[in-house]
Amino acid sequence: MTTILKHLPVGQRIGIAFSGGLDTSAALLWMRQKGAVPYAYTANLGQPDEDDYDEIPRRAMEYGAENARLIDCRKQLVAEGIAAIQCGAFHNTTAGVTYFNTTPLGRAVTGTMLVAAMKEDGVNIWGDGSTYKGNDIERFYRYGLLTNAELKIYKPWLDTDFIDELGGRQEMSEFMSQAGFGYKMSAEKAYSTDSNILGATHEAKDLEFLNSSVKIVNPIMGVKFWDENVKVPAEEVTIRFERGHPVALNGKTFTDDVELMLEANRIGGRHGLGMSDQIENRIIEAKSRGIYEAPGMALLHIAYERLVTGIHNEDTIEQYHANGRQLGRFLYQGRWFDSQALMLRDSSQRWIASAITGEVTLELRRGNDYSIMNTVSDNLTYKPERLTMEKGDSVFSPDDRIGQLTMRNLDITDTREKLFNYAETGLLSSSASTGLPQVGQLQDKAEK
């Protein structure tokens, strides 16, 4: 059964994810004029650059929407963001600086909650503003069909009739003006921005060129920490977790996760914390580049991982990182609610996050420059007295360590035999430049 409609389904209800921008405004008006019955759905994701959400549905009605609804997605989005922190669901990093998958998290929430609202209204055709070259077209496709199995997809930007008439921003602006709406294009920026309460993404246009740095970006969630004229005084902040959940900042307990995230954004944003420049692989395997902001997510992530390293053992931490990278890829690909992702997510939340109770104090400076000042938890397995270099009681003696080292002789002998075998087959050279044990000095295999 075909789920993607290439041409406008005249006379039928179409739900459009309506942002109020030029693209979706022109698309909604065009669909109404061509005989479709558009319904507008706007997601309140707590975008830091959106001033008046209530105005957006009103504009949609003016442009011809049969009905327009504002869906508050903030609570669910913050819940998914905290879940991603608990699981370390982040796979794009550059030299230890992380992209917190804030756009994929936003798409997971938008794609399910808007389609669920459409289904309530008897709307089974969905359109949005994603293009065929990007990730969002697949993310929305997956989340939409997961939510409504009867869903069909119509995107004006895949309809040649729409593209022929309104293929560019200039044409769309003139179309709106001719219809009596006097829509003026905003000044063109050197890049495009997409944001939600968890973070902001800046990409495309000038940022497609790698010689355009973060310095051309005007942050919307923080300060230009690279600008020496911007004063950024150092600041200490304490973050408290209970059973993996952030509950307090600087001693203030929050019962509302949305308010906690907003405060975390304010604290981190004062320093430009969480900004990163990433080259990543899109779902279609083509590489793209983005500049990201996520001050609150970064603040919570740093504190959470500090507690993880102090509470859990090495094998558990290794599994946490491995599963987190895999889960981050699933999230990026629009598979956050697939069974393989739910399995990894449940594992981390159940066995790792549940033990994370404690407080971490950080000193924030400029950008991602910070120091960990203190770590406190009743669950810490870090016990300095176990490994103290000072004289005193110890949990093990010198003789105990001699016995432990003696047991290592077994695997050391095995390794030496393998090195000898590698030398015999030519895999190892006896050259001193290899940095490996001099194979010529190994005992003859027959003598072992």
From Swiss-Prot:
Catalysed transformations (reactions): L-citrulline + L-aspartate + ATP = 2-(N(omega)-L-arginino)succinate + AMP + diphosphate + H(+)
UniProt KW Amino-acid biosynthesis keyword: yes
Gene Ontology cellular component terms for the protein in this record: cytoplasm
What is its subcellular localisation? Cytoplasm
Positions contributing to L-citrulline binding: Y99, N135, R139, S192, T201, E203, E280
Q: What positions does the entry give for ATP binding?
A: A17, F18, S19, G20, G21, L22, D23, T24, S25, A43, G129, T131, D136, D194
Keywords, A to Z?
Answer: Amino-acid biosynthesis, Arginine biosynthesis, ATP-binding, Cytoplasm, Ligase, Nucleotide-binding
Query: Pfam families recorded for this chain?
Result: Arginosuc_syn_C (PF20979), Arginosuc_synth (PF00764)
Binding of L-aspartate, residues: T131, N135, D136
Key word Cytoplasm present: yes
Q: PROSITE patterns given for it?
A: ARGININOSUCCIN_SYN_1, ARGININOSUCCIN_SYN_2
> GO molecular function, one example?
argininosuccinate synthase activity
Enzyme Commission code(s) on record: 6.3.4.5
Please give a single GO biological process term from the UniProt record. argininosuccinate metabolic process
Q: In which pathway does it act?
A: Amino-acid biosynthesis; L-arginine biosynthesis; L-arginine from L-ornithine and carbamoyl phosphate: step 2/3
Subunit structure as annotated in this protein's UniProt entry: Homotetramer.
The family annotation for this protein states: Belongs to the argininosuccinate synthase family. Type 2 subfamily.
HAMAP family from the entry?
Arg_succ_synth_type2
Name of the featured protein: Argininosuccinate synthase
User: Which organism's genome codes for this protein?
Assistant: Pectobacterium parmentieri
**According to the entry, what is the taxonomic lineage of the organism?**
Bacteria, Pseudomonadati, Pseudomonadota, Gammaproteobacteria, Enterobacterales
